[in-house]
């Protein structure tokens, strides 16, 4: 079990490992870096130098923050993971990590993507758990008639740059209520 310090930038989780800034991205299936391998947790791991035409420098420019590696699910999925925002740490382990929580919820994996079920406006909604996304996205039926709380620019490799309205909406897991900043993906 190894505990790493994390930083956050514009909603992104940045893991610091031996001076390298690593974007933790559960929404990306593959790891991307400048080189085709890198050392992590005492092992050498394969990574792509680009994905869908985007290299790590392109990703850094889109983020306005220089990262050395985007760690995707091909690598994250090899470990148990615990993210603790309050202590600004992330723990990786080859064995299950014991912890206490006010609630637990099943996390599902579908073709390498992680999803979680939230209750939003008394309806269960399955959403992607994407630590690489700075905005959580939900269907327009949930944001209809909500108060607009500004706009944000985001990027999706299949869509490009786009602007989305932002809404603060309460969600819950097992009765634990928390605010979420939701946006809407553009119509495709």
Regions found by a protein language model. Give the residues of each.
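Pepsin/retropepsin-fold aspartyl endopeptidases
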Residues: 1-188
């Amino acid at each position: 079990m190894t505990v790493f310090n994390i930083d956050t930038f514009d909603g992104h989780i940045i893991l610091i490992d031996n001076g390298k800034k690593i974007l933790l991205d559960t929404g990306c299936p593959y790891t991307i870096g400048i080189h085709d391998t890198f050392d992590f947790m005492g092992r050498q791991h394969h990574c792509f130098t680009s994905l869908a035409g985007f290299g790590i420098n392109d990703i850094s420019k889109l983020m306005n923050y220089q990262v050395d590696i985007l760690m995707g699910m091909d690598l994250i999925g090899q470990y148990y993971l615990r993210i603790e925002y309050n202590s600004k740490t992330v723990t990786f382990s080859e064995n299950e990590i014991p912890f206490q929580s006010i609630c637990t919820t099943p996390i599902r994996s579908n073709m390498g993507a992680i999803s979680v079920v939230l209750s939003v406006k008394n309806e269960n909604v399955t959403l992607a758990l994407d630590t690489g996304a700075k905005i959580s996205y939900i269907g327009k039926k949930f944001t209809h008639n909500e108060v607009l709380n500004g706009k944000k620019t985001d990027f999706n490799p299949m869509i490009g740059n786009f602007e989305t309205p932002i809404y603060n909406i309460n969600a819950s897991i097992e009765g634990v209520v928390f605010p979420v900043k939701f946006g809407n993906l553009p119509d495709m």
